[in-house]
């Protein structure tokens, strides 16, 4: 099937069917979200997978009582950063350099350029920007879920 056919298959479920999503399909969806492009490569969000029934019930209370929240197999929560701090940006760069086996200082100039660009824009702009980046990842997860017929 093509991407367009997968997306045409996709729909907003109003009632869940009670089936558990197989772990391999969930992993595929999460990997698509992880591989999503983001501005400056920072991925300024975290994706939480929630399947604990008690926690889902609490989330339902603040999600306008939507039954899908409690009836789903897994709930993915995309939590965007509330700002671009030196600590957060450094953590991303350090992780990347560790994965590549390079010294942390390898991309210091680029990291400092990013911080110099984002910091003066203020916390409200930063939070809005991070939220927009999380939407891109969310869209990739939706496309992957459609491909997996979830």
Regions found by a protein language model. Give the residues of each.
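Acidic, surface-exposed loops and disordered segments
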Residues: 1-150
